[in-house]
Amino acid sequence: MAGAARHGDRLVMIDERGELSYKQLDERTNALANAWRERGLKSGEGVAILARNHRGFLEAVFAAAKCGTRIVLLNTSFAGPQIREVAQREGTDLLVYDDEYSDTLRGIDDPPRGRFRAWANEPGDDTLDALVEGADTSGPPKPDESPRITILTSGTTGTPKGAPRSEPRSLSLIGGLLSKVPFRAHEVTELCVPMFHALGFMQAIVGVGLGSTLVVRRRFDPETTLDSLEEHRATAMVVVPVMLSRILELGEDKIEQRDLTDLRIIFVSGSALGADLARKATEAFGPVVYNLYGSTEIAYATIATPEDLRADPSTVGKVVRGSIVKLFDENGKEVPEGESGRIFVGNLSQFEGYTGGGNKDMLQGLMASGDVGHFDPEGRLYIDGRDDEMIVSGGENVFPAEVEELLASHKDVQEAAAIGVEDEKFGQRLKAFVVLRSSAKLTEDEVKDYVKDNLANYKVPREVVFLDELPRNPTGKVLKRELAERDEKGDGKASPKTNGKAPSKKKESAKASSK
């Protein structure tokens, strides 16, 4: 919290409780750290945090860091069994949580150093506020160990894994970020992404380092976000693509009613932005969209600037300074420009291997991102699809992402996803799941014809299922595992070809939204 000395009374956060200054954050986190140390918390022990976006989250992180602990950021969508599994695996000695998760935490043994409420509906001795009131606000002794942060993977393919990091060995990657995205000192940043997510956490840390003001809310609402951008004269907004899409769905009039002239940066990551959404966002807000390609494990790889997106809105941009990106074929040889290959990334901010054991594939000291892509002559990277999602249909390689992006560009389609399914004739074919725009009508044959008119025949989905919504995790990634499980159970029947709003659609959507 060296920033507190430099930024003092400047606001570090505005949340639903009001304003919090850097000085207050420093003093409150000193008090929390001292209170926890009195309760026996030691360097190297584990502090788990289950909280939404508010000051309590940030206070818990900085207090735990001042104690030199292992900080584990829990996903707020986890069910009780997942919480128990992660807490046991990561070693939780102290737990910080919001009141709304009390039921989720039932049946979980109290950690040895206690559990404390960050967002409390009712006051009590177990709240962070109560600990702060009775504790010394002077700086705690320097811990014996440096703090470590563990961010959990999204869990889209199974049980979330812990991806730990120690203090950064170099600031080169942050320098690379700032060379691509013009974040400045004293930004006012509308931080919509959950801070337990890699993108949200990193932008919170970068913001604090720059003396910025973070504007946060516990739940995302698109219209409230627009109001907040105008009210606080925000200069930057950090979102995942599905959030940006929901803002744009409000319509041109709602956006133009607000004075957003201060907004210089819309920083997007967390899942694929897509060319159509990139175009629409640029049309609505101007050339302020920056698209980051990276992950919890590999950190930053590339960033598409407004100039890159103007040249081609489907690109994820050029390699960030401080990172290395290479593409390899199945034999481990680097592929020529323009050819697809597995994406491998190297930098000094990558994770240290999963806490439960295992790691990502490594080649020549570089880490696999899990995606396949290609470079254009200007050095811009394009994502062709997930390495593990590619199917072979009639001897041809097919990536669902290409079909998904095409379907999303249809005027009647809100969003779409595709998975590979077995096919007697072709070996594998795609199955598409489509969400229509409000009051739109589209038949299965019309969807197939649209793909056939724009892509090769072997990329046309064998089936099309219409849903009310796609199953997603809290940061907007489509849970294709759930779609595949439904297909294996025989629940994913194609909708009748006469009308995309057929009665069977409700049956499909009910299953898609159950969690």
Go through each PLM region and give its residues:
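Conserved pre-ATP/AMP-binding loop-to-beta segment of ANL
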Residues: 9, 123-125, 129, 133-152, ...
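Conserved ATP/PPi-binding loop(s) of AMP-dependent carboxylate-activating enzymes
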Residues: 318-322, 333-364, 396-398
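Gly/Ser/Thr-rich phosphate-binding loop
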Residues: 209, 234-238, 250-312, 324, ...
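Conserved AMP-binding/adenylate-forming core of the ANL superfamily
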Residues: 11-54, 58, 62, 79-84
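Conserved structural elements of the adenylate-forming
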Residues: 26-31, 162-185, 245-248
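Conserved AMP-binding A3 loop
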Residues: 21-23, 148-172
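AMP-binding/adenylate-forming catalytic core of the ANL superfamily
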Residues: 56, 78, 97, 227-229, ...
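Conserved AMP-binding/adenylation subdomain of ANL enzymes
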Residues: 171-188, 196-236, 250
